[in-house]
């Protein structure tokens, strides 16, 4: 078994740990565990991705096939890059309540690291998205050595914009993306090494 531990501290009381245990990345916060997904996460993932309310920023709920493809894409990202969107679970119960992580996205003819997050509706307004996103921001800068991280958020998704502000990101641009047959305006948020 390969075990290593890295302690990453961000200003204030926030301390996050990353562990690599048997090649499965884990980030821990006070209330959350952020881990790689596996095929056994398909059902809790489907509960999130197939909810119209959660997925409005993506143009609506995913089908079963789109959900499976989404999970497969994350598993490929882990294998190819060592990161992607991870499962976010409650420390006390182990319940998967959302996803958060870092993916590579196209922006202004560049490929940039983006922090993304999606949470089950029953777990909104608890600060979980900001807690997980801050852990991912720390990981992206301290462990993956990105100098700048982005969040590209649909202009109508005010809740996600608030999360970006809470983790220290600021708007830098507005773009239009074509996704699932729709043109959608997005705000590009970013944060660099402080």
What are these regions (language model features)?
Residues 77-81:
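Short loop/turn motifs at secondary-structure junctions and domain boundaries
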Residues 53-73, 84:
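Conserved GNAT-fold acetyl-CoA-binding loop/helix
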Residues 3-55, 85-194:
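Acyl-donor (CoA/ACP) binding surface of acyl/acetyltransferases
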């Amino acid at each position: 078994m390969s075990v290593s531990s890295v302690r990453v501290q961000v200003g204030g009381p926030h301390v996050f740990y990353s562990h690599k245990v048997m090649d499965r990345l884990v980030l821990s916060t006070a209330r959350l565990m952020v881990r790689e997904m596996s095929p056994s996460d398909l059902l809790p993932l489907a509960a999130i991705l197939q909810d119209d309310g959660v997925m409005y920023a993506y143009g609506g709920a995913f089908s079963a096939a789109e959900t499976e493809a989404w999970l497969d894409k994350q598993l490929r990202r882990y294998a190819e890059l060592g990161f992607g969107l991870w499962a976010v679970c409650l420390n006390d119960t182990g319940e998967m309540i959302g996803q958060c992580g870092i993916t590579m996205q196209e922006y202004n003819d560049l490929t940039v690291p983006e922090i993304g997050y999606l949470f089950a509706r029953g777990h909104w307004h608890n600060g979980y998205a900001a807690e997980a996103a801050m852990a991912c921001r720390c990981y992206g800068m301290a462990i993956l050595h990105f100098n700048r991280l982005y969040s590209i958020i649909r202009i109508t998704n005010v809740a996600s914009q608030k999360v970006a502000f809470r983790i220290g990101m600021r708007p830098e641009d507005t773009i239009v993306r074509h996704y699932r047959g729709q043109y959608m305006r997005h705000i590009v948020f970013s944060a660099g090494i402080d």
